[in-house]
């Protein structure tokens, strides 16, 4: 089934199908492809930048895998919890190929389970959250285009030039599940706000701002807090335009996601102000990451000599990426040599 999607004010129209291609009897949806594409871009970004945050790439992979898998599961559970009456069987709950993920559920799940995975793999938690915040913006910016192919997550009527119209928007707005503030009327035959586009643009603008701020960050967790504030602020006003989310206070048009977004903004701003004042007098120092190989060697040395420690090396966060790479490689070479010599001594003894 295809949808004719039109932007009348711009003179544009697109014939869209939710299904990108099929493998046998299995349909592969654009929604899933957009999410997968965003995830791949976020992974590339994380691998390129992790050294600047004192994170070893090999250990980071385990954290990301756990965070992604359980984050997606949390996103689905959050979505189902918002409208449990739409799901009759466990198979309905598990059917996510064609949509049905709540971003805030994914964010919460990824931070919680990703944080636990960091503890397990010895990855610094707050620097990982900083990196994840930028990764989220990449994934969310790309993933929202899945809503475009599905023709979902759009807003109320608009007369703006970029207003969007399709049979899917018309059919949905004629249904009984539309949620709009009291006093707001909807005309199914009129164009609607392409809120997926608003959020995608908002995410990529936020990404550019946070990347520019990497060298200026004041404390570990700084970028993660700014991510929460930026995304929360955008989500709050974009959500007000939506017609498909749960209204908590119909008379005010207040939605569940707006409440979460407001809490993220208020809490994030308060913490940002407090921590910036606390750490403004000294530059942020990044502890260089040990490779997985060196941590394994260190564990062997600890078995024979529990009190043995490896000297840490730090670098100012504002240092160039090239310097981080050079110093991290040199540091790990020295540590590897030191640990191998220590193991040889123990073996000879």
PLM regions: where:
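A feature for loop-to-transmembrane-helix boundaries and adjacent hydrophobic helices
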Residues: 1-349
């Amino acid at each position: 089934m295809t949808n004719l999607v039109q932007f009348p004010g711009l003179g544009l129209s697109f014939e869209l199908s939710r299904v990108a291609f099929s493998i046998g009897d299995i349909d592969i949806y654009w929604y899933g492809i957009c999410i997968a594409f965003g995830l791949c871009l976020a992974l590339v970004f994380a691998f390129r930048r992790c050294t600047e945050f004192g994170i070893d790439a090999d250990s980071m992979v385990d954290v990301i895998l756990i965070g992604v898998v359980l984050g997606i599961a949390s996103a689905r559970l959050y979505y189902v919890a918002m409208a449990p009456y739409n799901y009759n069987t466990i198979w309905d709950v598990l059917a996510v190929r064609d949509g049905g993920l709540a971003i805030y559920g994914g964010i919460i799940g990824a931070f919680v389970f990703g944080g636990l995975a960091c503890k397990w793999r010895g990855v610094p938690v707050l620097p990982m959250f900083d990196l994840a915040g930028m990764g989220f913006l990449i994934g969310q910016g790309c993933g929202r285009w899945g809503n475009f192919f599905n023709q979902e997550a759009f807003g109320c009527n608009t007369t703006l030039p970029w207003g969007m119209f399709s049979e899917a928007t018309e059919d949905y707005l004629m249904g009984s599940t539309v949620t709009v503030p009291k006093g707001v009327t909807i005309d199914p035959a009129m164009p609607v706000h392409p809120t997926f586009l608003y959020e995608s643009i908002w995410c990529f603008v936020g990404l550019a701002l946070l990347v520019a701020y990497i060298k200026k960050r004041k404390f570990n967790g700084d970028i993660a807090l700014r991510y929460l504030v930026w995304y929360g602020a955008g989500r709050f006003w974009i959500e007000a335009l939506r017609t498909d989310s749960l209204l908590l206070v119909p008379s005010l048009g207040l939605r569940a996601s707006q409440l979460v977004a407001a809490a993220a903004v208020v809490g994030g701003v308060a913490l940002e102000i407090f921590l910036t004042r606390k750490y403004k007098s000294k530059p942020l120092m990044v502890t260089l990451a040990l490779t997985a190989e060196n941590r394994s060697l260190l564990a062997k040395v600890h078995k024979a000599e529990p009190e043995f420690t490896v000297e840490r090396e730090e670098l100012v966060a504002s240092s160039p990426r090239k310097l981080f790479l050079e110093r991290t490689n040199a540091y790990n070479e020295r540590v590897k040599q030191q640990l191998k010599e220590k193991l040889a001594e123990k073996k000879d003894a």
